[in-house]
């Protein structure tokens, strides 16, 4: 009598034994394992590539929107700068600018609406909504109370607004990944557009507005001349930064070289004309105060327009 009678003597399932039983040899097993691992790696790589591609698309879209946002804010900056300067001339006694002031008043409303439009779409993404709302409300409040302020106080108040606008331009460049471009030529180009040009136009705008006001009010005192000269020196230093940036960009990006050559040629020509005019005032070569204030302002405007030649409407 068998001792295991009535008992199931069939051995339990064993993975390795089963493989031996079906005679799957080691090379085949290794090949199957390699195929399995390779499939997993390919799947992971595809997922990574797709994710990177999607991020690049989003980053590119954000950068394009950042450029649009910055261009519209730059146009607003120019508008506020011109209004600040001409309003100062009017408060100092130059009545001939009143018609242009009315035009600028309407223009500011349109420029604000243009920024509103792009901020509604991208303000949350760029974290700019709150800053822009503050700037917009500040402009509205100042336009209502500007006549109650002393001319110098009104000029300073508008300068506070332009400082906030320039900060917004930099912030948008940062949040839209414009200023983090790893390419050297692209970095210098974005740095020029985001940092140097806004500061340069603001220094030129302050010099234009304050000097024209001094001339209109016949107040070219030694102290005022000293302040104008200091502003001119700061503008000159920023001009040198602009020239260096253009040189680097052209050297590393031949595609942009010809366009930048045209731009910097016009900009430097505008700078020379403004500098010559400024020196004439400092030397007292122009004596017709009222005509001189408008002439000086117009030369300053031509300079700023040449500086902003990279911003396409």
Question: Where are the predicted features?
Answer:
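Hydrophobic alpha-helical segments
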Residues: 2-313
């Amino acid at each position: 009598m068998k001792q295991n009678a009535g008992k199931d003597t069939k051995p339990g399932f064993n993975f390795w034994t089963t493989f031996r039983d079906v005679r799957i040899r080691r090379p085949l097993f290794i090949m199957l394992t390699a195929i399995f691992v390779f499939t997993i790696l390919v799947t992971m790589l595809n997922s990574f590539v797709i994710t990177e591609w999607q991020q690049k698309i989003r980053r590119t879209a954000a950068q394009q929107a950042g450029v649009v946002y910055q261009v519209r804010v730059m146009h607003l900056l120019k508008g506020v700068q011109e209004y600040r300067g001409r309003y100062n001339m009017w408060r100092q006694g130059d009545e001939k600018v009143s018609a242009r002031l009315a035009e600028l008043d309407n223009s500011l409303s349109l420029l604000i609406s243009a920024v509103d439009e792009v901020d509604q779409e991208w303000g949350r993404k760029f974290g700019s909504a709150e800053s822009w709302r503050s700037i917009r409300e500040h402009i509205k409040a100042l336009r209502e109370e500007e006549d109650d302020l002393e001319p110098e106080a009104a000029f300073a108040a508008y300068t506070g607004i332009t400082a906030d606008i320039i900060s917004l331009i930099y912030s948008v460049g940062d949040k839209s990944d414009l200023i983090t471009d790893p390419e050297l030529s692209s970095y210098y180009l974005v740095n020029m557009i985001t940092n140097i040009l806004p500061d340069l136009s603001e220094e030129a705008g302050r010099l234009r507005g304050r000097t024209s006001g001094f001339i209109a009010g016949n107040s070219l005192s030694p102290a005022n001349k000293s302040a104008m000269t200091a502003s001119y020196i700061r503008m000159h230093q920023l001009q040198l930064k602009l020239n260096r940036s253009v040189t680097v960009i052209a050297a590393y990006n031949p595609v942009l070289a010809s366009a930048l050559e045209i731009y910097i040629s016009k900009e430097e020509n505008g700078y020379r004309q403004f500098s010559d005019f400024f020196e004439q005032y400092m030397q007292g070569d122009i004596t017709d105060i009222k005509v001189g204030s408008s002439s000086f302002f117009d030369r300053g405007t031509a300079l700023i327009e040449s500086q902003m030649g990279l911003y396409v409407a």
